[in-house]
Amino acid sequence: FEGDPLFFFFFSVRMHRSHPLAKLPALTYDDLDGQTIISKGRAYDCFRHHIDKYFLAPGRKIHILAETADESIIRTLLLHNKVINIGYDYADPLYPHPDIVSRTLKEEISGQMIYLVSNPQVRKTKAACLFRDYLLEWMKKKAVRG
């Protein structure tokens, strides 16, 4: 397999604006110690990897209230509970609410690169080639515009 880098997703922590952590400009894993979270969950391998590596292995404690990929459930729980959501920054503008704020997770590993992956051993269709070229060109233009 080979991959073309598309963009970097930063980790983002969303919470109700009245949550005590909302007063901080950015958060660390230590800030999240002892917190109640709602997140995508074990269905996503990266969730389990990050929870194990950055929370449980160093001895930090978290309470997982719920695991769901449903943004409407996540937003409802953020609005009505003192929970936080650990996710990626792309979700911040997709599901805006005036009472939900987002803080960047400032750590050595603060996100991950997303790649367009292909198998060079498989012949691509013309449509697949056109889509790949379009997507890569679109990403370049988007990066230039900011």
Located regions from the model:
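Structural motif corresponding to alpha-helix initiation and N-cap regions
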Residues: 26, 70-71
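Generic preference for hydrophobic
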Residues: 13-14, 37, 64, 102, ...
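Flexible hinge/capping segments at coil-to-helix
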Residues: 1-37
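Beta-alpha-beta core module
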Residues: 1-4, 9-10, 72-121
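Secondary-structure junction motif
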Residues: 36-58, 124-126, 132, 142-145
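Short beta-strand-to-loop elements that line the ligand-binding cleft
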Residues: 40, 60-70
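Short helix-loop capping/hinge motifs at secondary-structure junctions, enriched
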Residues: 18-28, 107-110, 121-127
